[in-house]
Amino acid sequence: MTVNVFTPDTFGVLDDEQIQYQQLLIRTFESTVEEIKTLLVEKKIIAHVPVSQGKDSTVVEIIVIEAYRRAIAEGLIESDRPLILSTVDTLNESIPMKMYPTFAKRRIEAYAKEKGINMYYDMVTPGLNDEYFVKFTGG
């Protein structure tokens, strides 16, 4: 029988440069949330965020949802202000990428409801004549 000994000093250690980078990311996130809150309050916008549930659009989605959550919690905007998210299923994705947006949508909707955010999340597909396969093979 082999016994592995856990040594914490070889696992999960961040150097100063990595810590500074993480702190920069946190400051950037916080300032971006504040900028979105400013738009929500001063310009009275209704945000529409197109999301693919990939890395980039998910970061934007998280920032906007957090700005709504904070603005509502602080009484800066009305809780019935809509937040609109939309995802396009191109009908040309791999099976995991086809499944993940639906999986994520349910969880995002539950989170928004829990936080009192009036979110509308629409998932759309192109019409038959606009499908990639039809356009690609149809000449």
Which residues make up each language-model segment?
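ATP-dependent adenylation/nucleotidyltransferase module used to activate substrates
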Residues: 2-139
